[in-house]
Swiss-Prot record:
Keywords attached to this entry: Flavonoid biosynthesis, Isomerase
Taxonomic source organism: Arabidopsis thaliana (Mouse-ear cress)
UniProt KW Membrane keyword: no
Family: Belongs to the chalcone isomerase family.
Residue numbers marked as site, Important for catalytic activity: Y99
This enzyme's EC code(s): 5.5.1.6
InterPro entries per the UniProt record, alphabetical: CFI, Chalcone_isomerase, Chalcone_isomerase_3-sand, Chalcone_isomerase_bundle_sf, Chalcone_isomerase_sf
Catalytic activities: a chalcone = a flavanone
Record's miscellaneous remark: Part of the biosynthetic pathway for all classes of flavonoids, a large class of secondary plant metabolites, many of which are brightly colored.
Protein name stated in the entry: Chalcone--flavanone isomerase 2
Pathway: Secondary metabolite biosynthesis; flavonoid biosynthesis
Length: 223
């Protein structure tokens, strides 16, 4: 299936390209939206091509405001049977411990609220913290999370603009992968700007007659 034709998105001084190759599956994913988390990071969310027909069945015809305010819409993005990739690029320096402990705090809250937090999730959290233990993220460096529908979370690091071809670690826990993404774009996610960008971009794509024609999409942002 071809990727929908989308433009790059510009957030502050950072540019997210229209498509990237996942380090988990090596599939090409399209840029669904991008925004920032206050002054700390900028976030780009990429989706597998099949995401568009998958969400269109229920959400085609909705405008950006309706999607932005819809908890079920973002739950479908988080839990849908298609690959998702989130690229988190640093605006200020953070250590791996600083970053991972805050992410874990948010993810544990999400998983416990769902009533599905078990020993498997606790073990996955420990693995997640270990991956970040000795890392340092200067401004411009990125963390890539590839969430595969079969239940794995691939984590990769990059000091450059490109997404690495392979991940540093793979954690096989479906709930953790979903919680990481939900902590960014869910109802109480850290980046309302990314949530809004996804809603605007996907609404335009779903409501176009031919989302694969590059003339149909011309959306940029300076969130």
């Amino acid at each position: 299936m071809p990727l929908p034709s989308v433009t790059p998105l510009h957030v502050d001084a950072f540019t997210f390209p229209p498509a990237v190759e996942s380090p988990a599956s090596h599939k090409r994913l399209f840029l669904g939206g991008a925004g920032k988390f206050v002054i700390v990071t900028v976030i780009g969310v990429y989706l597998e091509a099949m995401a568009l027909p998958s969400i269109s069945a229920k959400w085609k015809g909705k405008n950006a405001k309706e999607l932005t305010e819809s908890v079920p819409f973002f739950r479908q993005l988080v839990t849908g049977e298609f690959e998702k990739l989130a690229r988190v690029t640093m605006k200020k320096r953070l250590t791996g411990i600083q970053y991972s402990e805050k992410v874990v705090e948010n993810c544990e809250e999400i998983m416990k609220a769902s009533g599905k937090y078990t020993r498997s999730e606790a073990k996955a959290i420990d693995q997640f913290l270990m991956v970040f233990k000795n890392q340092d993220f200067p401004p411009g460096s990125s963390i890539i999370f590839a969430i595969c529908p079969k239940g794995s979370l691939t984590i990769a690091f990059s000091k450059e603009e490109r997404v690495p071809k392979t991940g540093k670690a793979v954690i096989k826990n479906k709930l953790l992968g979903e919680a990481v993404l939900e902590s960014m774009i869910g109802k109480n996610g850290v980046s309302p700007a990314t949530r809004k960008s996804l809603a605007e971009r996907l609404s335009k794509l779903m409501n176009k007659k031919d989302p694969y024609n590059e003339a149909n999409v011309n959306v940029a942002t300076k969130n």
